[in-house]
Amino acid sequence: MRIHRALFVLLVWTGTLTFVEASHAQAPAAAKAAGAGKASKAGVPTLKPEVHANLGQLMKGILYPNSNVIFAAQDQNPADVKPAQDPSTAVNPLASSYGKWEAVENSAMALVEAANLLILPGRKCANGLPVPIQNPDWPKLVQGLREAGLTAYKAAQSKNQDNILMAADTMTTACANCHDKYREKPNLADRCK
């Protein structure tokens, strides 16, 4: 019995030492990984915005699909959309786990937040030209998108399709104002000029 107890104590002691050593060995690696960005005074890494997508990718990946959710709510009452067989994997936001009017609200807020992505320095248009954030009209056009998104959000909160019709009209105007100037060019190389 004494041998079993001694063996047990030895195993616990060895396990504790191993755990402590492993913890100390991982601490510098974790600290180094956490410090990938510059650390602030509080020791928290600071992050800077990074631009990875071009303007076309941003439009196709965020603005276009979220605008379509709002446009879809003009014709079909989101409250009447049946959930998908598996809402967690639904490709239609209106039939997803966060569907119905909530999907319209979320899409509107995605447009509002995406406006911030349109003013980040360093983004390129699909043709390689810089996004014209320095042009005097660009901030107004981006603000028009932001306001259209907020209008759509309020309309979605009201759960009223007449309000969505008006919000969609505001959104169409905001999109057209920018597209008419910077996108609708016969030659791709002339976009963003």
Where are these regions (language model features)?
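Bacterial N-terminal signal peptides
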Residues: 7-18
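Boundary at the C-terminal end of the N-terminal hydrophobic targeting segment
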Residues: 20-25
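Extracytoplasmic c-type cytochrome modules immediately beyond a signal peptide or single-pass transmembrane anchor
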Residues: 27-170, 184-193
